[in-house]
UniProtKB/Swiss-Prot annotation:
Designated name of the protein: Peptide methionine sulfoxide reductase MsrA
Stated family: Belongs to the MsrA Met sulfoxide reductase family.
Organism taxonomic ancestry: Bacteria, Bacillati, Bacillota, Bacilli, Bacillales
Gene Ontology terms: biological process: cellular response to oxidative stress; protein modification process
Keywords, ordered alphabetically: Oxidoreductase
Length: 123
């Protein structure tokens, strides 16, 4: 299981659904202080939640590192709380790792963005 936030969760979910080896996806919210927030509450930027997609995948077909590459390749990490026309703290870019995968972000494509000189990476 992996969880990513990279903008409006509907588009992010569709992107991950196209990846071979992804079994299922679910959208929701993570972080924040409001228990069981509604979409309307999250969009006020007062709950602290981010829109996320939980990705269930078969590690025999796709690795966490490959999913992380999909994450980096499908959003602009240089704009804070904005992805395309969507703006707000709920549009944060983030990913959550498991104990087994926590070392992977250290060698991820974030470095590719930095080397390309695109500006500050905002997670």
């Amino acid at each position: 299981m992996a969880t990513f936030g990279a903008g409006c969760f509907w588009g992010v979910e569709e992107t991950f659904r196209q990846v071979p080896g992804v079994i299922d996806t679910a959208v929701g919210y993570m972080g924040g202080t409001t228990e069981n927030p509604t979409y309307e509450e999250v969009c006020t930027d007062k709950t602290g939640h981010a829109e996320v997609v939980q990705v269930e995948y078969d590690p025999e077909q796709v690795s966490y590192e490959e999913l992380l590459n999909v994450f980096w390749d499908n959003h602009n990490p240089t704009t804070l709380n904005r992805q395309g026309p969507d703006v707000g703290t709920n549009i944060a870019r983030l990913f959550f790792t498991t104990l087994k995968s926590k070392e992977i972000p250290q060698k991820n494509p974030k470095r590719k963005w930095i080397k390309a000189g695109v500006g500050k990476i905002r997670l």
